[in-house]
Amino acid sequence: KLVMVDNEWNIFSAYRAVYGIGYPELASLEQAAEHGPGLVDTLFFPGCSLVSYAPELTRTVGRWLTDNGVAWALSTDCCGSPLMSAGLFDRAAALRQRILDQIRAAGIVRVVTVCPGCGEEFVELMGDEVDIVPLPELLLKKSRAAERAGRPTGFAPLPERSVTFFDSCHD
């Protein structure tokens, strides 16, 4: 039952509650949706694992987004992949629709994902109306622009070439 990520209490929300993991200092997708367009234009969707098990990394990415001029909100939701894996397609669709409705209400035009599985789910759901950007691509793009402007980022002097990025997700 804890894998039912569309429930208020699930494996990830329970873990965050037990270990006191929360993000009250950050704008949430729910707050952005209630506010309406203009508060943020980007949603940071770290995925259920990162947002639950790596709160400092989640906050570090958030600081990086802010430092790079991104107006963003955080989602602590799961993309619904566990529901899909369990064959609960209607529940997964309802969860995704709720997230999409909030994205639309907030006027969000870009979703930054960490988990490639979440990225794939969102491209399928809303790729025609929202730009879905994997975090590594955004890091590289923003860092290259900063380097060209004379602001060192630690990425130089990497040449333009293909690199391998390993993630441990299920995809």
Task: Give the ranges of each region predicted by the language model.
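A cross-domain feature marking catalytic cores of carbohydrate-active enzymes
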Residues: P46, P136, D167
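Short, acidic/turn-prone active-site loops that include or flank metal/cofactor-
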Residues: P134-K141
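Iron-sulfur-cluster electron-transfer modules
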Residues: K1-V130, K142-A146, G150
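Redox cofactor-anchoring modules in respiratory/redox and cofactor-processing assemblies
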Residues: E147-D171
